[in-house]
Amino acid sequence: MTLIIDTASLIGGGILLLLVLAATLTDVFLRKSRRTENPLVAHEADKIKEMAEPSYDYPPVSIIVTPHDKAYELDQHLPLLLEQDYPAPFRIIVVFWRGESETDEVLKKYAANPHLYATYIPDSSRYMSRKKLAITVGEKAATTEWLLLTDVTCRPQSKYWLRAMARHATQERNLVIGHTRFDDDTPPFRRFLRSYTSLYLQQELARGTAYRCEGNALMLRRSEFEKRDGFRANLKYLRGEYDFIVNEYARPGATAFENSEDGTLLELCPTDKAWRNKLLYYMEDRRHMARTAAHRWRHNLAQTLLHLSVVALLASVLLGCLTARWILVAWAVLLLAATVGLRTWICLRALRSMDEDQPASRLFLYEMRLLWHYLAFHVRYHRANKDDFITHKI
């Protein structure tokens, strides 16, 4: 067997190397998540948690929860909110729909708790997003400057969750975004996608202005919510409550991101329908959000370079075998192995920084799957009736 080293092989090998390097340098996982520290540390001697950082001027907070036909989840997670260890006044405002008898029964169990306040929305309220209406009613019931929006399908991992979020509520800030992980019962690819998206948004926030909120915890100022007339600018869209708030309210240097262990929520595994709808509704919502083109270009570039490099490597192996350019074949195989190994290590390192446990053997395949996953949902979205994404048909 003759080893052929010709000009075409050298040029092709150089192009392959450049493609692999470019794909690696644009990998979202290359910059791992920067974790915020837990606000408290445990002392083994006396089992008492004390402040490990300078004292914070914790503000009074109203936590708004908007369950709809989720009495079981409310019963499981409401006690975790009511038992938060927080040095300032706080109140849990639960907004539910009149006629939800199971939710009403759950609230009666905790009615004696001074931190709980419940109100309802009449059945006659129509023609707008249930969630947006419930949040607006909760805001009207609040008496504090800082509001904390969260979902009943999520639970705090610690009784110091509220401390972790509220320590960022300083004079110069107007938004605090909290990280949310899926629980271990959630399929691995969904957990991978949540981590990928959250990390991408963190990096975007670090470079300037937050684009949207992927998680289920968002702090904002009540005065600003009222000044901007709440959801008036996006009232007709059924979903995207947190996304629209962040997209409209965020400004450089005024948004904090909380992702410590204490400050991270754990979300129950969503149903297949809820999972599909979340992405489909986001595809509609982003058409009406600012900075969408700037938000998408890094993801599109990274995915394009990844797939282009893999296709080029596989094509080089095939072409080299057909033309007996065995040096080119060996070089392409080496670069392909290096790509898989290096990207797996980079991804595993980033996921571990987010407390996300994934099998290393699947990570490269998950990265490759992202493009096809989004393309499949693009097809679903373009086939969907666009009136399904709004509250009043136009």
Region spans (language model):
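Acidic donor-binding segment of Leloir-type glycosyltransferases
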Residues: 79-125
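N-terminal membrane-anchoring/stem segments of glycan-assembly enzymes
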Residues: 1-52, 347, 374
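Long helical/loop segments within the catalytic core of UDP-sugar-dependent glycosyltransferases
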Residues: 112, 118-125, 130, 134, ...
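Acidic donor-binding/catalytic loop of UDP-sugar-dependent glycosyltransferases
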Residues: 151-167
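Membrane-embedded multi-pass helical conduit in multi-pass membrane proteins
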Residues: 305-387
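Cell-envelope/extracellular polymer assembly enzymes that use nucleotide-activated donors
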Residues: 59-62, 91
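Short aromatic/hydrophobic "clamp" motif used to bind/position activated sugar donors
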Residues: 135, 147
